[in-house]
Amino acid sequence: MKINQPAVAGTLESGDVMIRIAPLDTQDIDLQINSSVEKQFGDAIRTTILDVLARYNVRGVQLNVDDKGALDCILHARLEALLARASGIPALPWEDCQ
């Protein structure tokens, strides 16, 4: 999936996460995480984000994650909404998701 434009998903409310994405000129993934629960769950947050990006074959992006204690399912949903917005498609290609 190609990221064409910057996008934002989520809020800064307690129990939620705000994620910003922007395309990069390289194939790197620049991931910055700021979380109120980073000491306990930072590795799990990073793993979830990288798993979702790999599932949709996303490369060459900068991600800024401001987590306020979001559950894994919320993080997953926010990421999928963000990818749809940033790629300019109305819905994710569920049938292509492996």
From Swiss-Prot:
Gene: citD
InterPro entries membership: CitD, Mal_deCO2ase/Cit_lyase_ACP
SS bond list: none
Localization in the cell: Cytoplasm
Purpose: Covalent carrier of the coenzyme of citrate lyase.
A cellular component term, taken from the record's GO annotations: cytoplasm
UniProt key word Cytoplasm: yes
Xref: Pfam families: ACP
Name of protein: Citrate lyase acyl carrier protein
Keywords: Cytoplasm, Phosphoprotein
Quaternary structure, from the entry: Oligomer with a subunit composition of (alpha,beta,gamma)6.
Domain of life: Bacteria
Protein family: Belongs to the CitD family.
O-(phosphoribosyl dephospho-coenzyme A)serine modification, residue list: 14
